[in-house]
Amino acid sequence: MKKNPSKNEKEINHIAIIMDGNGRWASSRGLPRYEGHLEGLKTLRKLIRDLKDFKLNYLTLFTFSIDNWKRPKEETFRLMQLLRKFISNDLSELHNNNVRVKIIGTRTNIPKDLIDLIKGAEKLTLNNTGLYLQIAFNYSGRHEIINAAKKIAVSAVNGELDPNKIDSNIFESNLYSAGVPDPDLIVRTGSEKRISNFLLWQLSYSEVYFEECLWPDFNKSKLDEAIKDFMLRSRRFGNIINEFG
C-alpha cells in the first residue's frame, strides 16, 4: 500500500541511489570487475538492513542501465546473474521484514527465467507495507518518459482519454514508478557528478548529493552524512522563503 509523502520538507520519505564505482573498486585492487559488483551487493544487503534505523519509506536503486548493454557481453551476463543472486538469496529476508520489492524498467532483452523471478518477487511482496524497495533494472529515464507518452497517445487515439485533459498527474500515472512519490534526495557514489539518465521526470525538485567513495565502500555512516547535508538545505520548490528568520 502506498504511503503518503511527508509534508515536512525536512523529513526524508524517499532516497534514490546511483550505486557507482564497483568496477573501479575492483580494478584498484587488481580484481576482475565482477568482484566489485559482488562486493557492491554485500554493501547493498547491509545498507538495507541498516535502514531500520532511518525513518525512510522508499528506496530506489539504479542497478542496471539500458546503456549498460554497450558493455562486454560477459559483464552484462554477470550483471543479470547478480539480480538473480539478489532475488534468490535475499527475497525471503526482505519479505520477512515486510519489504515490498518493485523492479522498474523495460523487460526487453531480459532472459525469461529472470523475468519470472522478478514477477515472483513482486507478487510475493505485493501486500507488504514496510520499506518500498524500487529497483531500476534495464532502466533509462528517457525510455520511461517515451514509454509513458506512447501509452497516453494510444489512450487518446482509442478515445479513452481527452488530450486536453492530459496533465502531470495523468503522465505520472503512466510512468514505471506510478504511485511512488518523487525522491527527496538523490545520492550518487563514486565521485562522478551527473545523473546518468536516472529518474529524469521524478527528480525535478530532488536534492542531489555526490559522495566521493566508491559504492562498495558506502555504509550507514555515509548515508547519515548525506541525510545530515540534506537537512541543512532549504527546499524552495520554486517559491521564496525568508532566509533571515
Predicted regions and their residues:
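Flexible, compositionally biased loop and terminal segments
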Residues: 1-245
